């Protein structure tokens, strides 16, 4: 019971009038394994060359978790039906990743007990052209794990859980009108 005399209905309603930059991205693209591994989250912030493609493919995962051990990752993309080649902006993915990492939502994942405190991050992958110019620049949701068997069946099960979590997070986000 409220003893201050103020009712819930007298509280201001906050409405975000900014356009939602992710509203047009209605498809979630299944996980793509990144062949790069990092020795700790701090090392994942700089563009890292691919072991298979060298500097022709660079990935910055930007993991923010508190664990200091090795990690490997997957990219989970967001797509548009009308413009399949368009990806969201990196800065627009950051608030969505914060939502996905919410300690209120992470326990919904079946593999919650094996997760670190922030398995989702706004990641980028860059492809270099033969001319040395930057070609494709893809911003996507990075999902990482610290399991001892990178890309094992258990690891892929976790990536599948992450995909489902992104789909559900997107539906929740849409229901409340974006972030």
Swiss-Prot record:
Tell me the Gene Ontology biological-process terms attached to this UniProt entry: viral life cycle
UniProt entry tagged with the keyword Protease:
no
Which keywords appear in this protein's UniProt record, sorted alphabetically? Host nucleus, Virion, Virion tegument
Subcellular compartments: Virion tegument; Host nucleus matrix
Q: Where do transmembrane segments lie in this chain?
A: none
Q: Which coarse location class describes where this protein primarily resides?
A: virion
Quote the cellular component terms of the Gene Ontology held in the record: host cell nuclear matrix; viral tegument
Q: Which InterPro entries match?
A: Herpes_UL55
Q: Which family does it belong to?
A: Belongs to the alphaherpesvirinae HHV-1 UL55 family.
Q: Please give the name of this protein.
A: Tegument protein UL55 homolog
Species the sequence originates in? Varicella-zoster virus (strain Dumas)
